[in-house]
Amino acid sequence: MAVYEVDGRKPQVDSTAWIADSAEVMGNVTLGPDASVWFGCVLRGDTESMTIGEGSNVQDLSVLHADHGQPLRIGKHVTVGHKVMLHGCSIGDESLIGIGAVVLNGARIGKHCLVGAGSLVTEGKQFPDGSMIMGTPAKVVRQLTP
């Protein structure tokens, strides 16, 4: 695992969090309890803060970047699928971001949402809690049932 300090900001990793050997985590990144970052991931908090909530997992080859003025927030018990790109966005608790999805600056995914594989959530788009979100550009397909 490669953990880098950037401009005096070093990642804060809970003692119960796990980072794969081939993952890279840099700058103002906070990993909560039982969070995990898998093989080949890059988490860049070099320009803004990033928070990965308790019990959340970032799967293989995903890239997460907090942009200038656009912090990246992942809630509790979130699954970020393989090869996902998250950029300066917010993901609500207990949501799932499908394989290969892209979520851009200022986008907000509510709690208990599902973003379909390969979907593109465009800049600034907001989705309410409990949404099934799919497509390019992404839109609400339906509300999920509890």
Identify the meaning behind each predicted range.
Residues 1-13, 18, 40, 46-76, ...:
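Glycine-rich hexapeptide-repeat left-handed beta-helix
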Residues 23:
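Compact, Lys/Arg-rich rRNA/RNP-binding cores from ribosome-related proteins
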Residues 26, 38-40:
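Short secondary-structure capping/turn segments at boundaries of alpha-helices and beta-strands
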Residues 26-32:
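N-terminal glycine-rich anion-binding loops that anchor highly charged ligand groups
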Residues 34-35, 52:
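Short Gly/aromatic-enriched secondary-structure transition segments
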